[in-house]
Amino acid sequence: MSRSPLKVTSPFEYNPGNSSEVVTYLQGLKGGDLPGTFLLVGANNSPGPAPVGLVYQGPLDAISSDGVSGSGVWSTVAVPASFGAAGTSVYGPDNLGEGQANLVGAYTRNLNGDSPTPEDPAIVGFVYAGAVDGSSEDGWRSVQGITQLGTSGTYTFVHSVDGGLAVGNSDNADVDDLTGYFSLSSTAFIVDLETGAQSLIRYPGQRDPLVTHTAYGIWDNEDGTYTIAGGSGERLKRGNSRVDTGEGYLIDYDSVTGRFSNYTTFAYRNRERTDLISHFEGIYRTKGGAYRLPATSVALNRKGDVGIASVVTVKRNKRGDFKPEANWRDLKVTRSSDGEMSVLSTANSQFGQVTVGFAN
């Protein structure tokens, strides 16, 4: 059965005046209050030392004027000045309706050239509850993750939020220069937005210090359980600081018992190619109970830059665990700058049939 062609809207940006120094990154997506509308979040110039957080409410249409896309409403978002932030990046939303939302992300700090420490971190996560445009000053809360060693992280990112829980990662290491993910053993956690309490995500088997997990997406199954998506990576040799293998994963979390179950990993196109590192960037659950995962796969070798954006569909077996064979659909995206096919694309978030990401 043939698939319908992709409808691509690119660029979709907030760049008043079309400045050549501004790049808009679309990082999180949920449904809006009205049919055909969305709640979209991201940042200008993220990653970077001083990103500007963004929230968009409206349809993802092709209307554009003077560098501003869409017929909806854009808002710039920043954590309160009291946080001492250099910049804000919004990674995930949860639309609560009637103009209210939960937002999660991270903010950068200016260390004036000093190395980060647990007492003086470089990047700190945040959670927010309030008006969708970020204007509720008392709705912001910093999140500094606790690593497996029990120390406060120097880098904390809160990636996704749904149903009152958020997931993220914390570490005392920088990110890998090839994949953009943590190169050392990263600590994935859950944070309760109401209480601020953190819980480590417990993966099965003995914890190998050479294996790292990230948590980039969480979905409330509305039965007391949540499903978490992310990536697992392994450094093949001690002393090698970069991730050398990687697969996307899903794991279930029971918020009542605190139990984790059904951990399953997924290689790019079911191991059709073994030279790519794959990572799930978010999660969406259909009405039929299947999960759509926006995924990014990057080259394992350094022969050339390649980034493949995909949407992966995973279903459950009758006994409730995940079927190991997933359906992968690669997204063929053209660059808005010249109309050529992108060789470096990411799929960052998913809602319904809509994927947002980046192409270069």
Where are these predicted regions, by residue range?
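Residue-level hotspots at or immediately adjacent to binding/recognition sites across diverse folds
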Residues: 2-360
